Amino acid sequence: MGSESNQQTIDDKFNRVDIKARNSKDEIIIVEIQNTRELYYLERILYGVAKAITEHISLSECYYEVKKIYSISILYFDIGKGDDYLYHGQNNFTGVHTGDRLEITTKEKDALVRKLPAEVFPEYFLIRVNEFNKVAVTPLEEWIEYLKTGCIRHDTTAPGLGEARKKLIYYNMSPEERHAYDEHLSAIM
């Protein structure tokens, strides 16, 4: 999927993301790397999610076709106070007077709701890279360690990091070395 400008009209805002992909459930994943503090950052990621939702449903489609969106923000600045490096946000419906959480029913015969809120509403992940200060054990932690340090461990088991290491080695070669490497690969294939 594209990841740059998706401006529909001249007066429309565009939504620049670093990676936009679909998973095996046809849900949309938006990944954005943010190096510097930005005014109205939360509003911008909300706009990006709304834009992605509307881009992936046409006028003739039923609202049931609305795609689930995951917004992942990799932050290299301090967005606020908190002890964790990974935060998750999702819509919940809470009683104003009672404080109880509304349990949506989808099983009844004439239910007006076919999906649970967790299956419909966007989810937001804020990864505060600079707050990661532990030994990476899980694949996610290995990725965050790489994002913080720029180094990939030789014993990594995280999906994609081994491939990323190979790409980094390739792109760190001089143009002459890359050409020789490409010629070598062509010769043996």
Question: What kind of feature is each model-predicted range?
Answer:
Residues 1-189:
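Elongated, amphipathic alpha-helical interaction scaffolds
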